């Protein structure tokens, strides 16, 4: 089988970009942000607390094109959320304006 130079270059480019695109979240950065914002008080990684686990949230948004934007909005606008006891409260907004940090946290949640 004979490969052209164009085919070879295209294959290398696809491999390089897909590795970058799917490199995943900076786990330590995301964990630091969850700690600074006390996220784990209400959310567990794989167990529900007052709020859904990160794993449950990831399953809810799996395969949805708007997952990142919906979660970014949720973390930055303080919407009303319903707790297990039926009461409602405002979800705390993440304490950073750095969109890269917020998107990293969302990527971390969606990877669970």
Where are these regions (language model features)?
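The canonical Cys-X-X-Cys-His
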Residues: 37-45, 105
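Electrostatic cytochrome c docking/interface patches
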Residues: 19-34, 60-64
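N-terminal export/targeting leaders of redox proteins
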Residues: 1-28, 112
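Axial heme c-ligation environment in periplasmic c-type cytochrome domains
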Residues: 50-61, 74-106
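Post-signal/leader-peptide non-cytosolic segments of secretory proteins
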Residues: 64-74
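Protein kinase-like catalytic domain
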Residues: 43, 76, 109-110
